[in-house]
């Protein structure tokens, strides 16, 4: 009763537009509501959306690999002074060791030892697809917003939105 009176009716279309946020109640400690959350989460998630570039819209089902760098993090491994560039795959299939064009750098680079990170755990991956986030070693050549692709024609993804501090 309390939930019925305190909330709006669920509308998947509003969730998809980002105008409504679903709220779930549960406890991972007691395993209350976890299964319900996971089942609903799977039905509510959307496939990767097309991303706008200077040449038009890049569809996630396009065969050519493309990605953009959205974060660079240094010193993630205390034993090494590493830098990891996090990128979101926008189209195509990523394969470990593949050669891509770094558009802003103007040259081809090989992306070896790609990683997926979850909290403090790192896992070397062999492949990833549109919508996935991967981390690659950054020898100092990447900047936030950089585009990487295997496409024949060069293009750059539109900039990442920035927000002024409040």
Write out the residue ranges for each language-model feature.
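Structural and coupling elements of P-loop NTPases
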Residues: 1-166
């Amino acid at each position: 009763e309390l939930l019925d009176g305190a909330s709006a009716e669920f509308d998947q279309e509003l969730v998809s537009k980002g105008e409504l946020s679903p709220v779930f109640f549960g406890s991972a400690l007691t395993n209350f509501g976890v299964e319900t959350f996971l089942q609903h989460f799977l039905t509510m998630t959307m496939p990767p959306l097309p991303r706008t570039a200077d040449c038009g819209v890049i569809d996630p089902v396009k065969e050519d690999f493309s990605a953009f760098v959205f974060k660079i993090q240094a010193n993630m491994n205390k034993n090494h002074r590493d830098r990891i560039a996090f990128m979101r795959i926008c189209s195509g299939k990523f394969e470990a060791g593949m050669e891509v064009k770094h558009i802003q750098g103007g040259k081809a680079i090989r992306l070896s030892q790609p990683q997926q990170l979850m909290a403090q755990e790192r896992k070397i991956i062999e492949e990833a697809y549109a919508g996935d986030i991967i981390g690659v070693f950054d020898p100092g050549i990447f900047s936030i917003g950089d585009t990487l692709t295997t496409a024949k024609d060069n293009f750059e993804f539109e900039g990442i939105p920035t927000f002024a501090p409040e």
